[in-house]
Regions:
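Extracellular/periplasmic, surface-exposed regions of secreted and cell-surface proteins
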Residues: 1-291
Length: 291
């Protein structure tokens, strides 16, 4: 489901564009599973589910996942020289814990088209030259599954899951039980990435060479991961998801496109690009006190 409202106006040397949008989606999931034993006749053609006498590991799982987004954006330019854009995005994810479901993610961009300045003299070398810069935040749900917000209770038989169950009674019979399968973290929140971009676009030599240079620096915080350390295995429950750690990605990308003609009937183009990327784990997160 999506709704969008836009407004555009040009007055003199000014250009204004406004947009508001809402999107919503829902995903429903249901899973039923069971194993049947105790068939009087073990011929394959007779081993229907209804002919069994002992149900093993019945499971019934149902959940809904909802996502809603609200976006507002405004763009302004003056005389094909100065360009500004600002936006705000508010996202809702039902799979996150109560009080952590919403995330706010702003962004801004600016550009300066130098060749549109009155003082810039037209020439055969530089046809267009533009500087760009932007900053923004985005959120993602990482490895959070659709059913994370659902409290999970499972019935397991040790014959199928050896790590579950207890031996009790005179004959040490292993009894089935109901247990909480996964720990839930009520403080789990959005994984966020904050990125800065600076770029240069140029069209040179009578529009034959297109050149673009981009530098970016991206910091991702509150990484969503399983709590692998400081979680005793004796608890008897799977470790929860947590926000922990920070990653930095920094890089430079250069792309070029050369277009020309040979005579009147033959045209050709050659493109190339080169990029560098440095990835660093700037914060490893919680450390194991035992090393």
């Amino acid at each position: 489901w999506e709704n969008t409202l836009t407004y555009d106006r040009i007055f003199g040397k000014h250009t204004l564009g406004l947009m508001v949008s809402t999107t919503a989606s829902q995903y429903s999931y249901r899973f039923n599973d069971a194993t049947m034993r105790g068939f009087e006749d073990e011929i394959n053609s007779m081993m229907y589910f209804s002919n069994g006498t002992q149900v093993i590991n019945p499971n019934d799982l149902y959940y809904k996942d909802r996502n809603v987004s609200y976006v507002a954006r405004g763009a302004y330019s003056y005389s094909d020289r100065y360009f500004f854009t600002a936006s705000m995005r508010r996202d809702y994810a039902s799979r996150l814990p109560r009080g952590k479901k919403y995330g706010d993610f702003p962004s801004v961009t600016a550009a300066w088209k130098i060749t549109s300045e009155p003082w810039f003299k037209k020439n055969n070398v530089v046809s267009m030259l533009k500087l760009r810069a932007s900053w923004g935040k985005i959120g993602n749900l990482g490895s959070i599954g659709y059913g994370y917000g659902v409290a999970t209770l499972s019935t397991r038989y040790p014959n199928d899951s050896p790590d579950v169950g207890s031996q009790i009674g005179i004959d040490n019979r292993v009894m089935a039980g109901i247990f909480l399968a996964n720990a839930f973290n009520p403080n789990l929140t959005w994984e966020t990435s904050e990125q800065v971009d600076v770029g240069l676009d140029a069209v040179l030599f009578n529009n034959r060479l297109n050149l673009s240079v981009d530098f970016f620096n991206k910091n991702t915080k509150n990484l969503i991961k399983t709590q692998d350390v400081n979680w005793p295995t004796t608890i008897g429950i799977a470790s929860p998801l947590i926000n922990d750690g920070q990653v930095n990605n920094r890089g430079l990308e250069i792309s070029a496109l050369w277009k020309d003609r040979i005579g009147k009937d033959i045209g050709y183009y050659v493109s190339a690009n080169v990029a560098t990327l440095r990835n660093r784990l700037t914060n490893i997160g919680a450390a194991n006190p035992d090393g």
